[in-house]
């Protein structure tokens, strides 16, 4: 897998917060007065298992997105013995202003990473693992082969572990990426739409809503038995009707599983929270998602893309192998 550039003096320098978002098309404007966090936004405190897992991760030099993206559920998920691993480094080639992962020119791929990841999964005794990555626009296949190598390595050392991949959009490299990931499939294929298309210039510069929908639709056509999944955040300026429109678009593109959670601002350099959706409204979205035909919907303030992914997948995999009637 060859890189486009080799000796780059800026490679490996990570920008965060306001430094990262300084050059995006629509500037991040802080609110005069921040919205007060409501009482339902609460994370659970970590247990001893959480600290054991952190030790294993440091030993194996692995990054979890749980840590890098400052996820509020980190204590709960680590305590259950589940984790989402971020491969291909912790420097992203995009500058999305909702995300707490650093931006810059990434380092070369680590050829030992698939083996290290597989060893971590085995050491942590995971039943279910989610693998995600930064965007790697510097790679000719967007990093798809590295995903495949990680899947293969885990299958060899932990054959009973279910694998979900949460992929970037492989912009400009979609054909080759889908081919690679069809040859070495995960158990669940996840790619997040993140928000309504009207907010893409503000929240997801460099990405395209229709392209992301097409990625999942095309993968489903190639691999009908692999459940597809996508997620969005609320609180960036969308309306309830916008959320419903996204759900309808997902179903029109054969996406079976959905996650919807509250956006929380990682720092003052990130997009402000424009609304806190109430637990009652999340319940309404959940009901509407099932009415639209999603096989599983994880919808609530503290839900993130990988939150309770093991439970979601168990249901979706039962349905897809048992011939559910959605397609």
From Swiss-Prot:
Q: Which cofactor does it need?
A: [4Fe-4S] cluster
Q: Which InterPro entries match?
A: Aldolase_TIM (IPR013785), Elp3/MiaA/NifB-like_rSAM (IPR006638), LIAS_N (IPR031691), Lipoyl_synth (IPR003698), rSAM (IPR007197)
Q: What is its main location?
A: cytoplasm
Which reactions is this enzyme annotated as catalysing? [[Fe-S] cluster scaffold protein carrying a second [4Fe-4S](2+) cluster] + N(6)-octanoyl-L-lysyl-[protein] + 2 oxidized [2Fe-2S]-[ferredoxin] + 2 S-adenosyl-L-methionine + 4 H(+) = [[Fe-S] cluster scaffold protein] + N(6)-[(R)-dihydrolipoyl]-L-lysyl-[protein] + 4 Fe(3+) + 2 hydrogen sulfide + 2 5'-deoxyadenosine + 2 L-methionine + 2 reduced [2Fe-2S]-[ferredoxin]
Key word Metal-binding present in the record? yes
Query: From which domain of life does this come?
Result: Bacteria
Question: Any note on cofactor binding?
Answer: Binds 2 [4Fe-4S] clusters per subunit. One cluster is coordinated with 3 cysteines and an exchangeable S-adenosyl-L-methionine.
Q: Which residues form the Radical SAM core domain?
A: 78-295
The EC number of this protein is 2.8.1.8
> Which pathway does this chain act in?
Protein modification; protein lipoylation via endogenous pathway; protein N(6)-(lipoyl)lysine from octanoyl-[acyl-carrier-protein]: step 2/2
Q: Name one GO cellular component term.
A: cytoplasm
- Compartmental location: Cytoplasm
> What top-level class of enzyme does the UniProt entry assign?
transferase
Disulphide bridges: none
Cited Pfam families = LIAS_N, Radical_SAM
Q: Name one GO molecular function term.
A: 4 iron, 4 sulfur cluster binding
Report residues binding [4Fe-4S] cluster 1: 66, 71, 77, 306
Could you say which residues bind [4Fe-4S] cluster 2 here? 92, 96, 99
Keywords, in A-Z order: 4Fe-4S, Cytoplasm, Iron, Iron-sulfur, Metal-binding, S-adenosyl-L-methionine, Transferase
Which HAMAP family does the entry link to? Answer: Lipoyl_synth
Regarding protein family, the annotation reads:
Belongs to the radical SAM superfamily. Lipoyl synthase family.
Q: What is this protein called?
A: Lipoyl synthase
What organism is the protein native to? Neisseria meningitidis serogroup B (strain ATCC BAA-335 / MC58)
